[in-house]
Structures are given as C-alpha cells and as structure tokens.
A protein has these predicted regions:
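Charged, low-complexity intrinsically disordered terminal segments
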Residues: 1-239
Length: 239
C-alpha cells in the first residue's frame, strides 16, 4: 500500500474546519457558524512536534460535491495543466478522466510539457482497470509518460507542477470524484512543498514500469479486448 497524506497546521486548518461544518450541515441540517469553532491559533508548539505553528506557505482548501455550482477541484487540475511550462506529475489509483482533464493533459504533452501519470499496476477493481486502458493508450499517443507502480497498491492522489504548486487530497482523476463525490484537496503554492512532492514521485518511479518503453507488441490487444474496453469506458461516468 502506497499513499500520500499531509498534516496541515496554521491558518489553512480553518479551511478544513469549514469543510467539515459544511458537510455536517449537508447531513444533519444543523448550521454551525459560531466563531467558537474557529479559535485563535496558539503560538505554543504543536503536540508531538518541536516546532511552533507557522504559516510557511500559501495553501488553499478546495472542495467539490454534488451540490457545488462548479467542479472546483477539476478546474484546479485543468488550470495546472494548461499553465505548466516544464512538467506536471500526477498520481491516482483510478484514471477515467473527464473530457476537460483529458484534453488538458494531451494539449500540455503535445505542447512540450513533461506530463507524467502514475497508476497502480494491479488495481482493486477489474472493470475500472479495463476502462482505464483506453484512456492510457490515448494519452500515451499524445506523449504523456505513463508509469505502472508495482511496489504495492498505489492510493496516492497528488499533482505537482513546475516546482511551484502541488495538490494532495481525496480526489481521484475520474468522473465521480470530480463531479459526484464529496471530495477535498489542499492546493499548495510554494516551491519547497512542490519539490517535496516531486521528489516523492521520482522515488516511486524506481518501483514502476514505464509503459511507453515497452515494445509495441506488448501493448497490442485483441479485437474483443478492445471491444470490452470500449464498453466499460461508456460506463466510466458512473464507476
């Protein structure tokens, strides 16, 4: 099992608290808006840490839900892809992108940006894996490098771009996460944080297989396999 999680301290915690209270209202219909739930930050050291609470970088908590007016997290992914100048690295356990993300990935790669995607070599849902293959072939044809992680089940959900921004959270690169589920991501706009995410991705590459480097005959599938993949792709929005 390979996952990525972050611990947030400082003013960014208020965003997570707000997310929790919004979800609480959705479930219980109890509006909680008291400032008691947003206490002043303490300057004392964090329990279990030798450091004090400091606001060392700019972070943004972004949420998405069925009731959201816009798919905000998806917009964040698309913006990172279209604004990237050097690279965009993405990890996700499930890859069935919306048309907006798919086009943004292909456009960035065709434009010379080093776009890399890492997914698990062995997933936990066979139908999802079948549907993902058609998308993987499509982005590879556009120049996206696709890595299959073999060091365990890859559950990490991150994006890092140009050593300038990164995001981590609960969002998969698929229809349900972007448009239907309750999801939350933290976007970091900080070079040091982005570099840490990039280095983690580069370490994971050592436990991965680059699909683009395999002989063409290894990537060929039968007519019936392609037919089944196409059928499962039609079901991607509800998977």
């Amino acid at each position: 099992w390979r996952d990525t999680m972050v611990r947030l301290t400082g003013n960014g915690v208020y965003g997570i608290q707000c997310t929790f209270l919004i979800d609480w209202y959705f479930v219980d219909r109890t509006m909680i808006s008291s400032r008691d739930y947003y206490p002043p930050l303490s300057s004392a050291p964090v329990k279990g840490s030798i450091s004090q609470v400091v606001n060392s970088c700019i972070s943004q908590v972004v949420n998405s839900s069925p009731s959201s007016p816009y798919p905000s997290i998806m917009h964040g992914y698309v913006r990172a892809l279209i604004e990237a100048k050097r690279y965009v690295y993405i990890q996700t356990p499930y890859f069935m992108p919306t048309e907006s993300v798919l086009v943004a990935m292909k456009t960035a790669a065709i434009g010379g940006v080093d776009v890399r995607l890492m997914v698990p070599r062995k997933g936990d849902a066979h139908v999802v894996a079948w549907a993902s293959r058609t998308y993987l072939r499509e982005i590879m044809e556009a120049g996206v490098k696709v890595y299959m992680y073999s060091g365990g089940f890859l559950h990490s959900k991150i994006l890092v771009a140009d050593d300038s921004m990164a995001t981590c959270g609960s969002t998969n690169v698929d229809f349900r996460s972007f448009e239907n589920n309750f999801e939350s991501n933290v976007f970091f706009y900080d070079a040091d944080t982005a570099v840490r995410f990039r280095k983690m991705f580069e370490v994971d590459i050592t436990s991965s297989v680059l699909l683009n480097s395999l002989p063409p005959e290894r990537l060929q599938v039968s007519f019936f396999a392609r037919l089944w993949e196409s059928i499962t792709r039609l079901l991607a929005p509800v998977m």
